[in-house]
């Protein structure tokens, strides 16, 4: 099978290219840019590609659909919206790592992304690809955001089984620097980040509406969540610590059983039998590791969800959705063990 990848210079695109190269069902990858009108050698993009013979072609929707079975967009928000319409019109398979088609409501996109949205008709063609909560997929798959993935996997059993007070959910999320993207800013500068923690986008993170959209599909009583994001001085990884009041007295064993029942058929979701996960448990893999606890003194359920933001939170989940769409083995081309030490 031949596949197309638009965007190989950002962190998610780099990881996705590596995963696609080692996928057993993929014979060839065609790379495309979205700026410029000339073909460039991949090896000129970064030193890591010096042995690569691939080239990056100018974007050409017609050529992509003619020569490939599917296209992956590893492009920034606002870019994919401008490129995707020919594929939507042709019902050509797309997996989109940007946030441009995750939200069903164009007004919500305008509010949270501060950009012009795709049309409501175009947005309606996309399905939200939370790969470990299988649902029917359309030809246009909107890959979830990294924070959204970690948070939703941590909340799904609580929401679907209505175990918590729906207005009591608090999420404290922490991410490594690669989640901020490749372009350096004052906030991501080494001097600002090293030996430091910094809260950002308090109650304003653009992944909030996609989380709410999915949570309300599971349980309409969830009207809002408190969600904070903190930048931490590590390269990769997301840890979300979730707090919610239980609807009735429980035990940790009962809470863990709810999670095990939800994920027992999902090879990439690990519910720990004891203790809490760390970033080292997942970085380099496509796994989500979950730890749970119940505090009877405060009647609070605590869930810790950890993922690699560039794998499960981006490229790995994109490949997982690719496997689902074409009915390949769910683990094909994906690492199930973390990189340790």
Swiss-Prot record:
- Where along the sequence do coiled-coil regions lie? none
- First-level EC class: oxidoreductase
* Record pathway: Amino-acid biosynthesis; L-arginine biosynthesis; N(2)-acetyl-L-ornithine from L-glutamate: step 3/4
One Pfam match, by short name? Semialdhyde_dhC_1
Q: Is Calcium there in the keyword field?
A: no
Q: Which residues are the active-site ones? A: 146
Q: Which GO terms describe its molecular function?
A: N-acetyl-gamma-glutamyl-phosphate reductase activity; NAD binding; NADP+ binding
Q: Does the keyword NADP apply?
A: yes
Which keywords does this chain's UniProt record carry?
Answer: Amino-acid biosynthesis, Arginine biosynthesis, Cytoplasm, NADP, Oxidoreductase
Per its UniProt record, what Gene3D superfamilies does this chain match? Dihydrodipicolinate Reductase, domain 2 (3.30.360.10), NAD(P)-binding Rossmann-like Domain (3.40.50.720)
Question: Which reaction(s) are listed as its catalytic activity?
Answer: N-acetyl-L-glutamate 5-semialdehyde + phosphate + NADP(+) = N-acetyl-L-glutamyl 5-phosphate + NADPH + H(+)
Taxonomy, superkingdom: Bacteria
Where does it mainly reside?
Answer: cytoplasm
Query: Which EC numbers does the record give?
Result: 1.2.1.38
GO term, biological process aspect, one: L-arginine biosynthetic process
Cellular localization per UniProt: Cytoplasm
Q: Name one GO cellular component term.
A: cytoplasm
Q: Family, per the entry?
A: Belongs to the NAGSA dehydrogenase family. Type 1 subfamily.
Q: Describe the task this protein carries out.
A: Catalyzes the NADPH-dependent reduction of N-acetyl-5-glutamyl phosphate to yield N-acetyl-L-glutamate 5-semialdehyde.
Q: Which protein is depicted?
A: N-acetyl-gamma-glutamyl-phosphate reductase 2
Organism of origin is: Lactiplantibacillus plantarum (strain ATCC BAA-793 / NCIMB 8826 / WCFS1) (Lactobacillus plantarum)
